[in-house]
Design a protein with these regions (language model features):
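Charged, terminal alpha-helix-loop-beta segments
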Residues: 1-500
């Protein structure tokens, strides 16, 4: 076989020197052949050598062995080196050497992984929908319609019937995938008007589908059919039943009252102007300045600090007072420096502070006290939103979700919390655990209030809310953009209602 012609430029020896120099400069080298999985390189799974006049590159791992003849290369960058290689039957192709420690190399590696998973997703669909036409399949971003490249999506068609499909990759968040799946379903229904797009097929990694399954149970089957599939590492796909995932990652700790003399030694700190004293459900007292906690009292002990906490002793009192003064100067609506870290930090906590102080402004039917934060607790930890649990004057619970910036996932994150509150309510656990003493709680499902600056509700919010079950009584409350100064309600919208 005659050799493939090499464009004029570097000799084979020079090409080898460039490759070796690039690899020596890499902190995290990897090899990428388009359409194949990324192959990390170590000194033990890679070789570059001359075989006669040919420069051969080989790389291997436990499942594959790659051998290519290198014929040319492009000018290298710090993050990647593009090679022209000869494959079987003299076919020419591209090969990339990447430094995953550099952002550009990591981005290309992620895109390659997305394309590989897209092809796995294609195989899933062929197996589950063998008689359907795979009309569209994409793993590219669509910013106009808020579609993420992290979750490949597809449109399946059979005559005048269609299905939306979306898959969560093995390392992805299956619960987040549902948000994008519902957006994709709505997009197809709006753009494929001659086809009845019946529902959404959601694919999730086996063992990680519970959060998505629980959310599916709270959607309206009349709005769309939703099918859940799980896949294994061996690409074995099974249809899942959301009703099989009834156990929740939630707990409800007993509600404890603080001791009568709790924190007497620290009353001077708690009484400082602008300090908020919030009693938590476990009896501890949180000391805050506009939502930002700087100290906590438990029994007669106080710990303080931003970030790293330490036990306070009497000689720390002056230091704590200076900390409060600093917070008061930086964390105020009248602050001159809006870029100051203490001003910008934890905006949801600041919004919570305003909501607690003016709960009846948000909804006149809500009792201002008691109001509980972060109960029930999530085993998964931080969720990026503030949860408050209140009760109205008739004894009906109300879940209040607070978000200071636009978040596509807010509706379904709020639904997570609503599901857990309803779970404990149905079992009578709030009353049994000491919450809302003296108030007879109604058995109706709780209300769900989404509170955010009016211009910060994500454009897809109405789309996702349109799929909620009628059992979920949801209301959006948009507050004025100057909410740090004053909490003013700009609109109230029920369900998926759109603002005029």
């Amino acid at each position: 076989m005659p050799p493939v012609d090499r464009p004029p430029g570097r000799t084979t020896v020079e090409i080898r020197a460039v490759i070796e120099a690039f690899l020596q400069s890499c902190r995290q080298p990897a090899l990428l052949e388009p359409g194949e999985e990324l192959l990390p390189l170590t000194g033990d799974n890679f070789s570059l050598e001359m075989r006669g006049s040919r420069l051969m590159l080989e790389a291997w791992d436990r499942t594959r062995n790659l051998a290519r003849r290198v014929t040319a290369l492009q000018e290298p960058s710090a993050a990647r080196l593009e090679l022209t290689v000869e494959r079987f039957a003299r076919r020419e192709g591209q090969l990339f050497l990447l430094d995953l420690a550099r952002p550009a190399g990591a981005d290309l590696g992620r895109r390659s992984a997305r394309l590989v998973f897209r092809e796995r997703f294609r195989l899933f669909l062929r197996r589950q929908f063998p008689e359907w036409d795979l009309a569209e399949l994409s793993a590219e971003a669509n910013l106009e319609f808020s579609l993420s490249p992290a979750f490949p999506r597809a449109f399946l068609r059979h005559g005048q019937h269609g299905w939306a499909a979306l898959a969560c990759p093995p390392e992805g968040d299956a619960a987040a995938a549902l948000s994008f799946g519902l957006i994709w379903l709505s997009y197809l229904r709006a753009s494929k008007r001659r086809v009845a797009v019946e529902g959404l097929a959601l694919y999730a990694p086996a063992g990680r589908e519970r959060a998505a399954a629980l959310r599916l149970l709270a959607l309206d089957p009349a709005a769309a059919r939703c099918e859940l599939f799980t896949y294994s590492e061996q690409d074995f796909v099974v249809r899942g039943d959301p009703r099989d995932h009834g156990n929740l990652d939630t707990r409800l700790d007993p509600c404890r009252r603080p001791a009568p003399n709790q924190g007497e030694a620290w009353q001077r700190i708690a009484a400082l102007p602008g300090v908020e004293r919030i009693v938590k459900h476990d009896g501890r007292a949180s000391l805050r300045v506009r939502g930002l906690e700087f100290a906590e009292i438990s029994g007669g002990d106080l710990i303080f600090g931003l970030g790293r906490r330490r036990a306070a002793h009497p000689h720390h009192a002056a230091e704590i007072e200076r900390l409060v003064e600093e917070l008061q100067r930086a964390r105020t609506p009248a602050a001159q420096d809006h870029a100051h870290p203490l001003y910008r930090q934890y905006p949801e906590a600041w919004l919570e502070s305003q909501a607690r102080a003016q709960l009846e402004t948000l909804d006149a039917s809500l009792l201002p006290d008691p109001v509980y934060g972060q109960v029930p607790a999530f085993a998964a930890g931080e969720r990026g939103v503030i949860d408050l649990l209140a009760v109205d004057r008739t004894g009906r619970l109300a879940v209040v979700e607070l978000k200071a910036s636009a978040d596509l996932h807010l509706p379904l994150q709020a639904l997570d919390y609503w599901i857990r509150v309803k779970w404990h309510l149905d079992r009578g656990e709030f009353t049994a655990s000491g919450y809302f003493p003296g108030i007879e709680l109604r058995p109706e499902p709780p209300r769900l209030l989404l509170v955010s600056p009016a211009l910060q509700f994500h454009p897809t919010t109405e789309t996702i809310l349109g799929y909620f079950s009628p059992v979920v009584d949801v209301e959006r409350i948009g507050v004025a953009e100057d909410w740090r100064k004053e909490l003013r309600v700009m609109f109230r919208l029920t369900g998926a209602e759109r603002p005029r």
